[in-house]
Amino acid sequence: GLAKDAVAIEINNVQRDLSDKLEDNASVSIITIKSNEGLEIMRHTLTAQVLASAVKNLYPDAKLAIGPTIEDGFYYDFLPPKPISIDDLPKIEKEMKKIIANKSTINKSYHSKDEAIALFDEQEEVFKAEIILDSDQNDNFQIYTQELSGFIDLCRGPHLPSLNLIGEFKLTKV
């Protein structure tokens, strides 16, 4: 039913995570995995939580930048210790499928600018720390964490509540 297919909500015309609190008298609609918005949220979760995590597992010294969705998919900008080629994609895809198979829950937490910078400085994620530092925002930085692996990423969200909702995908370009 609708509850089983729900992946996010829209509160006052803003997409939010299912875990977000509702405001009094808010206009609310449910976003399902079968909708265009749900597909975009799945792709966003796939890039921000799965592709980035797989790259960090395989190339621990890679530095993460940003990972948006695009019209027909997603990408993630990162700086690996050595160039990645099209021949590396099957290995990355295999790692992504392992991560998805764990069916990890994804949790969101909010942090001040200083806390968020400290979190990414500790992980030597210079691009993430720079994004936060350059932001006009002072608090409520959203950090998403995979419950099982502890992988974290800075992201605007929303994300799927669990990795087990991710469908089929194929990496095609470097």
Where are these regions (language model features)?
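Short amphipathic, charge-patterned alpha-helical segments
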Residues: 1-2
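Auxiliary tRNA-acceptor-end handling modules of aminoacyl-tRNA synthetases
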Residues: 5, 20-42, 54, 63-69, ...
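Sparse, context-dependent recognition of short Cys/His-centered cofactor- or disulfide-binding micro-motifs
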Residues: 13, 49, 61, 154-156
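Short amphipathic alpha-helix segments
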Residues: 46-58
